C-alpha cells in the first residue's frame, strides 16, 4: 500500500506514514 500525503491524517487508498505530520519522520 502507498502512503497518504503527510498533510492528511489518512486516506482510503493508503496508510498514514506520517503520524506526526509533515514535520515528523516517515514510518
From Swiss-Prot:
The keyword Ribosomal protein does not apply. GO terms for molecular function: sodium channel inhibitor activity; toxin activity. It comes from the Eukaryota. It comes from Anemonia sulcata (Mediterranean snakelocks sea anemone). Pfam families: ATX_III. The keyword Glycosyltransferase does not apply. Belongs to the sea anemone short toxin (type III) family. This is Delta-actitoxin-Avd2a. Specific arthropod (crab and insect) toxin that inhibits inactivation of voltage-gated sodium channels. It competes well with the site-3 toxin LqhalphaIT (from the scorpion L.quinquestriatus (AC P17728)) on binding to cockroach neuronal membranes (Ki=21.4 nM), and inhibits the inactivation of D.melanogaster channel (DmNav1), but not that of mammalian Navs expressed in Xenopus oocytes. Its activity is synergically enhanced by ligands of receptor site-4 (Bj-xtrIT (AC P56637)). Changing residue 7 to A: Loss of binding affinity to cockroach neuronal membranes and of toxicity to blowfly larvae. Changing residue 8 to A: Loss of binding affinity to cockroach neuronal membranes and of toxicity to blowfly larvae. It is found in: Secreted; Nematocyst. Changing residue 12 to A: Loss of binding affinity to cockroach neuronal membranes and of toxicity to blowfly larvae. Its main location: secreted. Changing residue 26 to A: No change in binding affinity to cockroach neuronal membranes and in toxicity to blowfly larvae. Changing residue 20 to A: Low increase in binding affinity to cockroach neuronal membranes and in toxicity to blowfly larvae. Negative results: is inactive on mammals, when tested by subcutaneous injection into mice at a high dose (up to 5940 nmol/kg of mouse). Does not inhibit rNav1.2/SCN2A, rNav1.4/SCN4A, hNav1.5/SCN5A and rNav1.6/SCN8A. Changing residue 25 to A: Low increase in binding affinity to cockroach neuronal membranes and in toxicity to blowfly larvae. Changing residue 1 to A: Low decrease in binding affinity to cockroach neuronal membranes and in toxicity to blowfly larvae. Disulfide bonds join 3-17, 4-11, 6-22. Keywords: Disulfide bond, Ion channel impairing toxin, Nematocyst, Neurotoxin, Secreted, Toxin, Voltage-gated sodium channel impairing toxin.
Amino acid at each position: 500500500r502507498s502512503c497518504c500525503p503527510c498533510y492528511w491524517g489518512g486516506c482510503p487508498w493508503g496508510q498514514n506514514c506520517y503520524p506526526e505530520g509533515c514535520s515528523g519522520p516517515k514510518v
